[in-house]
Amino acid sequence: YAAIMDAYQNRQDATITFEQLGVDRLYVDEAHFYKNLSFTTKIQGLNATGAEKSTDLLAKIQYLNEITNERGVIFATGTPISNSMAELYTMQRYLRPSRLESQGLYHFDAWASTFGQETTTMEIDPAGKGFRAKTRFARFNNIPELTSMFKEFADVKTAESLKLPVPAYDIEIVKADASAVQKELVDRLAERAKRIRQRNPIKLREGADPSSGKGMDNMLVVIKEGQSAALNPRILDADYEDNPTGKVSLCADNVYDIYQKTTVQKSTQVIFCDQSTPNSKAQYNVYDDLREKLMERGVPKEQIAFIHDYDTPEKKERLFAKVRKGDVRILLGSSDKLGVGTNIQNKLIASH
């Protein structure tokens, strides 16, 4: 507090450092949000590019580890490993770096050569038109030793050991046949992917620079457009005709069917969609389209809500209270905004 007041009074040096705050404990909930920590590797198939927030967290943790002998940071997460085996290395790097250093495993490739194994499998290529051999870091070695190192800093609780009350559920996969437009788009994307592999990509806009790659086609763009086309081609071009048997229409049919069957008990449903979110400048988005389709089928507008419209904790809690009571019966949101800290399960009957 004294450091803050001194800095406030001396406007010429108003910057407060993390050390000056006097922090000696750091609790990080949902710690998997900081899994993208950069590292150097020669292994293919790994995302070694870090996020700025993870680098910032590492700097703070390194300071706390130094002053607390690696006892000042507590992580809480249900998914310490979600997408990549390298995330386990990241957790060790955050919480037990001294152990990595003492074993000569602080650099990722040394850790990977001890605990990991590369495997080669056939998988569908990004364009979705063929297969290719892909080598990935996908299997653990020396598991007893790795487990022992992990348990030095991890207190692991499973759902079975906690005896969490998890309701029974059924999974239904809804199949949507590709439309003629979607098939045509996939063919175009496959051709673009082929040109990219041949180092002859198309220009995405006027003034594109082939030498620097700016404005030129790349696989990330192809994959993103492929995902959009698979959901609804209108994300790419709003002038495409609506498909009554497409994913959005089928979702509306299923949601309305459950809505009708559970009217008496006012059951609620949640719809997750990470693409084509509302409040964008695009002419078309899936959220507005789905709401319009539900309203056309008979769902009142006030019983449909977008989590994106509730941008403060207070607004979200008021929304969640309405969902728990069944006043709002259909809630749409993305995984980031609706997947964590959402207490709406009282009347929840289905998730789409």
Question: Where in this protein do the model-derived segments appear?
Answer:
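Conserved ATPase-coupling elements of RecA-like P-loop NTPase cores
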Residues: 33-53, 85
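Walker B catalytic acidic pair
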Residues: 29-30
